[in-house]
Each structure stands twice: as C-alpha cells, then as structure tokens.
Design a protein with these regions (language model features):
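Glycine-rich phosphate/pyrophosphate-handling loop used in enzymes and phosphotransfer proteins
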Residues: 1-208, 212-243
Length: 243
C-alpha cells in the first residue's frame, strides 16, 4: 500500500474515533467493525432495479414499456441517467444529509453508487463529473452543496475528474418542490451559467440528490450542450416511481 493511502486510512480511523460515523439510514453511531452503515440497516434501502425507464431511470411497473409516462410526455435535454434509491425508502436519510449537516453520508452514498451502478458508469465513459450547483446564498446558509459532496466522493473512487466550478447557479430560484412542471421550467430559465470553455469535454455526468421531473438537469444540460458538450448523463441518489 502506498504511503499516502496508509496516511489517508490512519486519518480516517482517527477521525472516526473523535467524530464517530453515523449510519445514513438510522442515524445511530455505526458500531466498530461495521463499515459505513449499520449491519442491521443494510437491507433497508430499496434500490431501483430493472425494468427502468431508458431515459430517467425510474422503476417501471410494467415489463413491456421502455419509457415512463413522464418521459413519453416530454423531451429531455439530458441523454439518460440512473437513480440509486427509491425516494421513499431513503427520504429521511436524504433530508438529514441535505438539511441536518450529515456530510459524512456522502461517502456511503458514493460507495453504494459505485457498487450498484459500476457497469453503467463504465459504459458512460465520461470525461467529467459535474455536481448540480446551488445558488451562493443557499450554499452560504446551508454550509455546503450536497450534490458536490457526493460528486467529490464519486470522483475520488472512480478516478473521473470533478469539475465543480464549471457550472454556476446565478439565479436564486424558488424551491422546485413547490412548483408545477411548467413553473419549474420557467423558474430555471437563465438560472445557470457555464464559467469556462467546455469544448474539450465530450461526455459528462451530472450528479444530484433527488430526481423529480428532471427540469433542473434539463436546464444544466441545455447550457452544457450549448457550449459544446455532446452527451450529458446524470446520476441521482433518489427518484420516485414511474408508470
């Protein structure tokens, strides 16, 4: 093992002693010997499995369709993507991660993404990982961008470079969960800005915590493709059910 890897593991072990890791599912301190999640909680997350929508990755109820109802009704700017969990099974976990400063959950989420979606990520063959940005005021009040924490861990374990400053959110928008689909699209017009030339990036993976309608990912994908990116994939932690 290389010296820096040994040092990294020692630092992690010391940090765990001073600030014990909490299980991302039950939020209890993870027992010594367990990894990033309690052994009793390992079976609780509900993963999105086949059949999945070929565009947004929602779990489909039927075997004879390729796309969910939402994706058959509207065209997306992103090419396709995947979500890891069914939203309801990890709703409380994501809430604590997003609003309760449980930043340490990011490592578990990223490791789980790699374990469950490794083949899909390899097939994407992306040049970069890009976290969906939050507005500077929201980042200041929250203290971090939850998507960037996941993206950073995913970049570390996959070796795909993260470009966290490439996309900026320049418009302070109303929270998307309060809006209809049309309102979401209008809310995000001119919300994002590409800060540098991206012509050298051919394929990228956007990373976000929750996929609802895809409006945010669409808005970012439009700007990236306008600046020369050819293919925009995404990976989200959670997504709802499809039809």
């Amino acid at each position: 093992m290389r010296d820096y890897e040994t040092g990294f593991r020692i630092k992690e072990a010391l940090a765990d002693l001073v600030f014990p890791r909490r299980c991302p599912v039950c939020d209890e301190i993870v027992p010594m010997g367990d990894k990033l999640i309690c052994s009793r909680c390992r079976i609780k997350p509900q993963y999105i499995r086949e059949p999945r929508c070929r565009r947004c990755g929602k779990q489909l109820m039927g075997e004879n369709v390729e796309f969910c109802h939402d994706c058959m009704q509207r065209k997306h700017a992103f090419d396709y993507g995947y979500a890891l969990y069914d939203y309801q099974s990890m709703r409380k976990s994501i809430y604590r991660f997003k609003y309760g400063r449980r930043c340490e959950y990011a490592k578990f989420y990223a490791e789980d993404i790699r374990e469950k979606l490794s083949d899909e990520i390899c097939t994407m063959d992306a040049d970069a990982i890009i976290p969906v940005p939050v507005h500077v005021s929201r980042r200041r009040s929250r203290g971090y961008n939850q998507a960037e924490l996941i993206a950073a861990e995913l970049s570390r374990i996959t070796g795909i470079a993260m470009h966290e400053k490439l996309v900026q959110r320049i418009k302070k928008t109303v929270p998307q969960k309060e809006l209809t689909i049309q309102e979401r699209q209008n809310n995000l017009k001119k919300a994002f800005h590409i800060s540098t030339n991206v012509v050298k990036l051919n394929k990228v993976i956007l990373v976000d915590d929750i996929y609802t309608t895809g409006s945010t990912l669409d808005a970012v994908a439009v700007e990236l493709k306008r600046r020369g990116v050819n293919v925009v994939y995404f990976i989200a932690l959670c997504i709802g059910e499809g039809m």
